[in-house]
Amino acid sequence: VSADGLQWSFIPRSGVTFSDGSPLTAAEIAVSLNLARISPLYSARFAGVTDIAAANGMVTVTLSRANGALPALLDIPIVKSGTEESLTPVGTGPYYFTTDEAGACLASHSGWWRGESRPAERIALSAARDREAILYQFSSHEVQLITADLIGTEPITATGNISYEDADTTVLQFLGFNTARA
């Protein structure tokens, strides 16, 4: 961090790879952060950012005014350049999207940089055409987890024998789990 707090430089963790095996670089991070600057979802976080650039293996973020909370605001998905417009962009997380004989799923990324075990090797995904279908799948135990946009125009609300869990995050999330067996 510069003395005036207007420039922050970050060195990417070494050994981090995308799920396709390619390395995470400062250039890849800068591309994702610059795309986030113009994204309706993340642009408010970048209100005080005047420049994001990659050079010499570092990402430098320049601010119009000092902001000690900048690192927390940069908690956004970093995706591989060229895949950002894809419905399934390539990332560095513990799981990646794929399809197999059983259908669409999130598969465990064996090269995940944290190296920690994951709760499941495969997480099956299920599509639903509307909120009623989502609630039906959840209440009939076809799916065990749903996410909901509680500030959307038609938030999903589930009732009955379910459990709500709170988790610290910089992004508002809601997870609902079935707690009874069918």
Specify the residue positions occupied by each region the protein language model found.
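Aromatic- and charge-enriched surface segment that lines or borders ligand/interaction sites
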Residues: 1-42, 60, 137-140
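Surface-exposed binding/hinge segments that line
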Residues: 7, 11, 17, 41-84
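Hydrophobic residues in beta-strands and at strand termini
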Residues: 10-12, 18, 54, 63, ...
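Short helix-loop capping/hinge motifs at secondary-structure junctions, enriched
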Residues: 16-22, 112-116, 181-182
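Beta->alpha turn/N-cap motifs
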Residues: 32-35, 65, 147-153
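A structural signal for short loop-to-beta-strand junctions that line the ligand-binding cleft
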Residues: 48-52, 58, 93-96, 161-168
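Gly/Pro-rich hinge or "lid" segments in bacterial periplasmic/extracellular proteins
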Residues: 66-124, 129-133
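Extracellular/periplasmic solute-recognition and catalytic clefts
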Residues: 98-105, 124-181
